[in-house]
């Protein structure tokens, strides 16, 4: 996009993405045209699993969760799926078994923390930093807090309240080989089907 920039007094060229993108490249640097009706991004678990119907909203029992935190440390999920949409397709995992138990106990609605494209999470796992917590540092110690703060701008922990593209699923929650274009949409839909 070529625009006049008063601060520089010149016409500048900027690379931008479509704010209404439904598909993006890794780290959201480019928009990708995605046909949302394409059967290749409609997994059977999403197409064939109906959403439960709750006629009276007063009957909802809601469980809120964060996509990454749900499975990031769950060793019953294959490592490459931890912290991703695809963890919700692992029905024998600790997390999914726990959700099934909650469902049997009356929980009937899952509320996800933001899953749209988030501005400040590095989508490539290799670019995500992990805090180096000093041995013996307590959870509320200054050392632990300093280690977390040192990588806060480059880690994968973020509640998601800094949207970049409202209509596209967050790429860091997709498995490494499925972060581009419609592939992350497919994995998001797999999660939805898995939760139903």
Language-model-detected regions and their locations in the chain:
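N-terminal structural segment of carbohydrate-active enzymes
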Residues: 1-179, 185
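Extended, hydrophobic alpha-helical segments in both membrane/secreted and soluble proteins
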Residues: 184-196
